[in-house]
Amino acid sequence: MTDYNKVLRSFIHFQEVAGFKLVSASDGEDRIKAPSTTEAVDWVLGTEEGSLSFAKDGHGITAYVIIGNEASATIYDFGNSKDIPAKTLKESDDAWTAWMDKWDALEA
């Protein structure tokens, strides 16, 4: 059985290493601002779908979460602020790809 707590903590870590700060978490209805990693993970795990929002240099990205997918597919999509620089978006995408590669390897 997949430990989604570990999966989401890992995703947050990969984004933080890329310089993105966790700024909010949503359970699909309500949002908590400036959560700790534990608060964010607990909040999102309280539902089947949620999101984690990050910021870097004033630009935001949101990772959409579905609980129940394979670990590497838990983050199923991204949204971003429209004026985000290509370099910043690539840094987030690269972190997401590295995270997926890690979980794909662990699931193999």
Annotated model-derived regions:
Residues 46-92:
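Intrinsically disordered, low-complexity regulatory segments enriched in Ser/Thr/Pro
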Residues 15-18, 24, 58, 82, ...:
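Prokaryotic Sec-type signal peptides and long signal-anchor helices
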Residues 1-46:
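Negatively charged, low-complexity tracts enriched in Asp/Glu with abundant Ser/Thr
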Residues 2, 24-27, 39, 54, ...:
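Intrinsic disorder/low-complexity signature
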Residues 7-10, 16, 60, 72-74, ...:
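A general marker of short, structured functional hotspots
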Residues 19, 26, 35, 41, ...:
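Intrinsic disorder/low-complexity segments
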Residues 12, 89-93, 97-107:
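Residue-level detector of alpha-helical secondary structure
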